[in-house]
């Protein structure tokens, strides 16, 4: 599936509504009331007339990898210079996209376009285990993991971030409970992406299990994730080997893009790819839901005939 067919994206400001809310009063991810005094991630249950479906995207990575700059470049079209973004505990930006979902949402009026609101979240944290909480992770639809190509330690941090996302998103059944709700559609639960653990055996490798006749349990699956290497414009100071980075991400079946918030290189592409993954999983989950409803209906008819 190519993400360009899923999204109708334009750089024209007349087609996109951008918003910045920076408030530290409430860092819980519950219901989004479209209130600037409530920094929340979660389901849109308020029939907001501005959009049809809310898609929460959590940006994770070391400090100073450029998460805030990328968010501003994507939602507002500029690169922040001389802006102090590090005192903002919860940095929230959003962008509205016309014709979102590739037919995922069925409108009562087919001539009215579906508006998807991408809400970007950036939590500034001293320790990656501090915030967001497990519930907050599970209320997120997709993740962008950042590293700075001029800072190798930020790249080495990726494995910890991936396992953190894996652990905090999965419930006891290794499923994902994150939802995005629409005014004119079914509630869609996020379906897991079939990625494998970095330590799991790859194709062609044999599993070392000589001491046990029982295979270890499979690791919890990963939600939709895109990894980005920011500051790719700074070629002279690049220390992360792009070939090694691609090999690592390929081993996880996670898309990798080298981007630049400064020059806008591949910024839109990264978000488009993530949205494509989210839409794909929503469609899979909806097909599963319809199949389950059909099975229940058949079972109900059988029970009625037996009476």
UniProtKB/Swiss-Prot annotation:
Keywords, alphabetical: Cell membrane, GTP-binding, Lipoprotein, Membrane, Methylation, Nucleotide-binding, Prenylation
InterPro entries documented for this protein: P-loop_NTPase, Rab, Small_GTPase
Residues with the Cysteine methyl ester modification: 304
Topology with respect to the bilayer: Lipid-anchor
PANTHER family assigned to the protein according to its UniProt record, in alphabetical order: RAS-RELATED PROTEIN RAB
Lipidation (S-geranylgeranyl cysteine): 304
Segments of this protein annotated with the region Disordered: 1-45, 175-223
Record-stated family: Belongs to the small GTPase superfamily. Rab family.
Compositional bias (Polar residues): 1-10, 186-202
Any single Gene Ontology cellular-component annotation: plasma membrane
Residue ranges the record assigns to the propeptide: 305-307
Protein name: Ras-related protein RabR
Skewed-composition ranges (Low complexity): 11-45, 175-185
A GO molecular function held by the record: GTP binding
UniProt keyword annotation of Hydrolase present: no
